[in-house]
Amino acid sequence: MPRIVIVGAGLSGLCTAHYLVKSLSEAGKEAEILLLEAEGAPGGKMRTIRQDGFQMEWGPNGFLTNKPHGMELVKDLGIEGRLARSSDLARKRFILSDGTLHRLPETPPAFFRSKLLSLPGRLRIVWEPFASGPPPGVDESLGEFARRRLGTEALEKLIDPMVTGIFAGDPDMMSLRSCFPLIYDLERKYGGLVRGMLGVRRERAQQGMKGEMSAGPGGVLMSFDHGVQTLTDALAGRLSEGLHLCVSVDRIERRGEAYALSMSAGGRREEMAADVVVIAAPAYAAAGMVSPVDEGLSAALRAIPYSPITVAALGYEKATMGNPLDGFGFLIPGGEKRKILGALWDSSIFPNRAPEGKALLRVMVGGVRAPELAALPEAELLAMARNELAEILGISDKPVLAKAFFHERGIPQYLVGHGKRLERIDARLAALPGLYLNGNAYRGIALNDCVRESRSAAGRIARTL
């Protein structure tokens, strides 16, 4: 019986194992599936922490229904009854501009009426259908794209905070095609964003789809009553026999047609043979593992950078806050020169995030914009976050809860040239049959993307056995 070893039991590793079991069963095939995790618990960054009645997310806080993959997995696991739908308030998102919070418009007409942009800035967006086309043969940055089609003001006040909220990155460094392939395709298919939105609206109408198309990410934000860890716990529960914790793989070698994994488990050095290896660890960890197999592959993986980010969770008494937190939260353009990237108003987004009469916020610090701030000592960082909230939201009370979660290498950065790097990685893997890479460092950082890529990888592996 062939042995498949998956290294890393975060979302991507757990999903790969889940879909492998399913694909092999449907194909009438058998294999031994082992899942090795260096930490003492599965789930990776999808971790829910509870303290004093507050429920905090260590990393991501949910997934959108604008793509089907997350909901399909939830139904596959039979945990639909545990889902939590975001409040309608979650559609109200804010941008800080000139020291004032402005609601982010959701539709093109609302954009034109918004005071977030100046009149010249709004007129520049109106001119978008007449903007120049994409430069041929160039991996354009998101910043270059936004300046070309929407103007500098839209880049600074809309696109920059959006990239901060998703990647904690710099739009002038991020690849449009790799970060936002749908926008890239929209321009090439329809000749522009406004034409593209009108074209998609016509297609939706022809297909009988109702509802106005939003300029935002679309879909409904979903989580679970007891946090996002519900999903990874459900996946891990299906794989309990094959899941091994506190096993750190540091080296993979080619042995004939198979692979040998060197690892540390319980203080002992061990070696394990495998016919198929799926590395579902971060790119920087994968780089070290594959160095003995292919130094060129290792170098390509090491070249994928990550932005550091710290999440500061702050709980307050609602009665004395002086701010209703009526919305999803706010993001801050770099031009505002603030010390935080933004904040999510978690207890306004989902139920059960704070005890009765209290509110929970999560403040984002660091990113590419200010990596040194993410690494501040916890007490200093929490004090800074409190000061920023006092100046922006008027919340001056001492919090009843204050915790910081530091992610030294938090979010992979799809820089200009990312697509070419993936081509080099794929070419190297083609010469190493039985070795696969999976995770959020390659073709999408969102939960839906990770589920989609895991299912695809499992299908490819099942077909080769």
Identify the meaning behind each predicted range.
Residues 1-12:
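Beta1/beta-strand and adjacent pyrophosphate-binding region of the FAD-binding site
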Residues 4-6, 33, 435:
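Conserved hydrophobic helix-helix packing surfaces used for dimerization/oligomerization
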Residues 12, 41, 284:
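Conserved Rossmann-like nucleotide-cofactor binding loop
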Residues 21-51:
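Glycine-rich FAD pyrophosphate-binding loop
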Residues 22, 245-361, 368-375, 379, ...:
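Mid-domain catalytic core of redox enzymes
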Residues 52-134:
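Dinucleotide-binding Rossmann-like beta1-alpha1 core, especially the glycine-rich loop
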Residues 89-92, 124-252, 258, 273:
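Active-site/ligand-binding neighborhood in enzyme catalytic cores
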Residues 105-109, 324-327, 342-465:
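Conserved flavin/dinucleotide-binding core of flavoenzymes
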